[in-house]
A protein has these predicted regions:
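Active-site hotspot residues in diverse enzymes, especially metal/ion-binding acidic/histidine motifs
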Residues: 1-342
Length: 342
């Protein structure tokens, strides 16, 4: 049974840059509360209802899952509390697992693996193609990581000034902040961070990145878009791939190519235009993998990035960005809505 409610965006803390909107939640055993604001956003409404359907089917509607929000989430607040206290509660672990399974169910229901993969190949993995399916860009990008025949993907969702709210790391990419909470010294050259806080950016944007992490060096390409969530907050979605496995599959020495590109970047202050050989290889991979935005990345300078700016690997060091606000309070909104309904 669906029950509709009205709840406007809420500024949880005075210093918070983002507002929070409670979109929907499941109340055991079989009631789904949905914000009237979703009536104006069919793509997000379809996703929310699919998630709650998954919870009912997979977990018998036991209610052990987080509310769906825009701008913040209760489990994110628990993550921040965990970082501070080190306490892990079994109920939180179970709730997080239920969240994941219900969300994955929704993705599989709305984007069945084989037909969706054929759709991606036909449309060259263009994120704008989500409009054809009346789906959100976020759902399409997340689902790419599950259906692609190429396994080396990563995906991030983030809010200003740099809070990760969703992470997939099939290619093992180190997190730009070390964990799911904000730290004081993030690398400002990650696209997922840089594009959030610049006043004007080309949207969407692809970027080739050389990631230096201790004695390991990686080569990634990410495609990043800035969108507005249902609460009106600026949100960033970033989908990326590890290029070295794809390069090696073509019989090309990936390490030699990486060293050449890194040298060009170091000599140019940390970023540089791709040389003709690297451009040729990237464009070839774009054609083989049927990923149009990979080919578009050759027109943007490659950047050296690091997990933390205090351990910057550029010859010319970067300047970190600082922020410390937190987002909490979803559970209290949920209780208020339930009390009104009763």
């Amino acid at each position: 049974k669906i029950k509709w409610f009205n709840q406007k965006t809420t500024e949880i803390t005075p210093q918070a840059r983002n507002k929070t909107l409670l979109r929907s939640f499941f109340e055991s055993p079989s009631e789904v509360y949905v914000n009237n604001a979703l009536k104006k956003d069919p793509a997000r409404l379809k996703y929310d209802l699919s998630v709650h359907l998954g919870h009912k089917i997979l977990h018998q509607g036991d209610g052990l899952r987080s509310a769906i929000t825009s701008g913040g989430n209760e489990f994110g607040a628990k993550d921040q509390n965990l970082a501070a206290t080190g306490n892990v509660h079994s109920r939180d672990v179970l709730s997080a697992w239920h969240d994941f399974e219900s969300s994955f169910f929704a993705g599989a229901l709305l984007c069945p693996k084989k037909p969706f993969y054929r759709f991606l190949v036909r449309n060259k993995h263009q994120i704008v193609s989500a409009q054809q399916l009346k789906l959100s860009p976020a759902l399409l990008m997340r689902r790419v990581t599950a259906v692609s025949s190429f396994p080396y993907w990563h995906y991030f969702e983030a809010y200003q000034p740099g809070y990760l709210t969703a992470v997939y790391r099939g290619n093992g990419i180190p997190l730009p902040w070390g964990n799911m909470t904000m730290v004081s010294d993030p690398c400002p050259n990650w696209a997922v961070f840089r594009l959030l806080n610049e006043t004007y950016v080309k949207n969407p944007q692809s970027q080739i990145s050389i990631l230096k992490n201790d004695d390991q060096t990686y080569l990634y390409c990410c495609h990043t878009i800035r969108v507005k969530d249902l609460a009106g907050n600026l949100k960033l979605l970033s989908l990326g791939i590890d290029l070295i496995p794809a390069i090696k599959n073509q019989g090309i020495d990936g390490n030699e190519l990486l060293q050449s590109l890194e040298q060009d970047c170091q000599e140019s202050g940390g970023e540089a235009e791709l040389n003709p050989h690297v451009k040729e290889v990237i464009e070839k991979l774009s054609h083989i993998l049927r990923i149009q935005w990979l080919g578009e990345s050759v027109h943007v300078p490659a950047r050296i990035i690091c997990p933390r700016s205090l351990n910057c690997q550029r010859n010319k060091k970067c300047t970190p960005t600082h922020s410390d606000h937190r987002i909490t309070g979803i559970e209290s909104m949920r209780e208020d809505i339930l009390s009104i309904g009763n």
